[in-house]
């Protein structure tokens, strides 16, 4: 229950909170246990100094990448998710840049269809100054994500240990 609300419709830059919208949309496109190959092209789209999840060229489950986006706020993981989902949306797309662009275009359509009318995103990591959202849209996406037990499990921890498809673990803090 909300007791006080102020400026909830005022546009603001979402920064890393953009990843919440990316995760919400990506979870509608693929199964959490989908195996995603992180390739150099997608990882290299990450802005210098923002690869905090240390995603490597190997296989991850989609839910591993969601955890990497949420716990250490991994921009590298966000690009890998956008690349993977862009490939699902447009299998003929030839480059990582094209797949990420297609994902972002479709994400923005999805946002409008879901009622996030004051949110527009241009970068899956939120590392841009043109994106906009509102506190109201952020509240709605968080409420929607909190319906999922996998999301609650990830965000309830400040350290997350992921089991990768090869059986090895990776820890994010």
Features from the language model and the residues they span:
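Active-site-adjacent loops and short helices of periplasmic peptidoglycan-processing enzymes
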Residues: 1-136, 145-149
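Domain-terminus/edge residues, biased toward the C-terminal soluble/receptor-binding domains
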Residues: 116-117, 129-137, 142-173
């Amino acid at each position: 229950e909300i007791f006080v609300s102020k400026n909830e419709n005022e546009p603001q830059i979402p920064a890393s909170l953009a990843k919440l919208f990316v995760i919400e949309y990506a979870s509608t496109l693929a199964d959490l246990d989908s195996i995603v190959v992180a390739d150099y092209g997608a990882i290299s789209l990450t802005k210098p100094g923002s690869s905090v999840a240390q995603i490597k060229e190997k296989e991850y489950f989609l839910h591993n990448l969601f955890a990497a986006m949420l716990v250490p706020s991994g921009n590298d993981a966000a690009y890998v998710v956008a690349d993977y989902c862009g490939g699902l949306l447009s299998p003929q797309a030839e480059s990582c840049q094209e797949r990420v662009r297609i994902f972002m275009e479709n994400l923005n359509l999805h946002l409008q269809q879901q009622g996030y009318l004051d949110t527009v995103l241009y970068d899956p990591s939120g590392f841009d100054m043109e994106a906009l959202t509102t506190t109201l849209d952020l509240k709605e996406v968080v409420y929607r994500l909190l319906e999922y037990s996998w999301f609650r499990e990830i965000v309830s921890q400040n350290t997350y240990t992921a089991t990768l498809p090869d059986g090895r673990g990776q820890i994010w803090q």
